[in-house]
From Swiss-Prot:
NCBIfam families named in the record: trpD
Protein name: Anthranilate phosphoribosyltransferase
Keywords for this protein: Amino-acid biosynthesis, Aromatic amino acid biosynthesis, Glycosyltransferase, Magnesium, Metal-binding, Transferase, Tryptophan biosynthesis
Binding residues for anthranilate 1: 79, 110
Organism: Cytophaga hutchinsonii (strain ATCC 33406 / DSM 1761 / CIP 103989 / NBRC 15051 / NCIMB 9469 / D465)
């Protein structure tokens, strides 16, 4: 690893195979914490290549527990995190709205590293029980149209980098990798990125995998559709910038999307959205993301119709019913 680190500090780009071997070595605990921190830091100072990202992804999937749920044709809705925006849990709420519309969801998530409350924090606080049992996950996705794969339970290799990530307290290559290494192997993907370069990288990765996907990046930095302005969409069908009114929705201020300072704050907003008692801004930003997700899983309907489907799921209480079944 010393030699590799020396090469990396001299602007060397890893091949796919070298990247995979490096990630396997880290995951298997063969690299000390100082070297892990140095390795991670390289990618905080320069952009990652497609080959490196592919190699890292392959290594993490090779080391993860089997949880293949592809027979259910599920979707994952996930952002990289690390955008520094501290929004409420938009992607996770969108999952339940999509589930309420009859689409299976296999959500890959984790505790917060660089924000106040991650997807795992809020669903656990509200009563969801994490499991890495395939039988439990099958039961959940069959009964609630939703299951959550809490990353540390499926990626034991991550335990070797968790302390370093926590100490760094900022986005790292692992933020980039999280959305790419869902052990459920979902059929459909809605991925949010914190910058445009990563959106393009994700696009290349998913095109090479023949995935059914959409990647979003809000032009003002959010890793999801924020309705605070324009946002880029890269998908099997689209590669363009959309505005909120292209979806029949309104534009909002960043402050209207705040997730609060604590898990309790985030959980309060979460339930208010599911009970259809939230602010219009909170409701519409969830509908925007859920609507785009529905349009990926149902490409034969328009984006407007997909948003209408999302609205029906939320306003009818079906989204909340899926949540209650998931946490029972």
């Amino acid at each position: 690893m010393k030699d590799l680190l020396q090469q990396l500090t001299s602007h060397y780009r890893l091949t796919k195979e070298e990247a995979k071997e490096a990630m396997l070595a880290i995951g298997n605990g063969k690299i000390n914490a100082a070297q892990v921190a140095a390795f991670i830091s390289v990618y905080m100072m320069r952009s990652i290549t497609v080959a490196e990202l592919q190699g890292f992804r392959e290594a993490l999937l090779e080391m993860c527990l089997d949880a293949d749920l592809s027979e259910y044709d599920p979707i994952d809705i996930v952002g990289t995190g690390g955008d520094g925006k501290d929004t409420f849990n938009i992607s996770t709420l969108s999952c339940f709205v999509v589930a309420g519309a009859g689409i299976k969801v296999a959500k890959h998530g984790n505790y917060a590293v660089s924000s106040s409350c991650g997807s795992s924090n809020v669903v656990e606080y509200l009563g969801y029980k994490f499991s890495n049992s395939k039988d439990v996950l099958r039961k959940q996705i069959e009964e609630a149209n939703f299951c959550m794969l809490h990353a540390p339970l499926f990626h034991p290799a991550l335990k070797n980098v968790a302390p370093v990530r926590k100490e760094l307290g900022m986005r790292t290559i692992y933020n980039m990798l999280g959305p790419l290494v869902n052990p459920a192997l979902p059929t459909y993907h809605l991925l949010g990125t914190f910058n445009m370069d990563l959106a393009r990288l994700y696009g290349y990765i998913h095109q090479s995998l023949n995935s059914k996907f959409a990647i979003v990046h809000a032009l003002d930095g959010y890793d999801e559709i924020s309705l605070t302005g324009g946002f880029k969409v890269i998908s099997n069908q689209l590669d363009r910038v959309l505005e909120p009114d292209d979806m029949g929705l309104h534009t909002y201020k960043a402050a209207e999307l705040s997730g609060g300072k604590t898990v309790e704050d985030a959980a309060k907003i979460f339930i208010e959205v599911l009970e259809n008692k939230s602010t219009r801004a909170q409701k519409e930003v969830v509908l925007a993301n859920a609507g785009l997700a529905i349009s990926i899983a149902k490409p034969d309907i328009s984006l407007f119709d997909a948003i209408a489907t999302a609205r029906e799921s939320l306003e009818s209480g079906q989204a909340y019913e899926c949540f209650k079944k998931a946490v029972k």
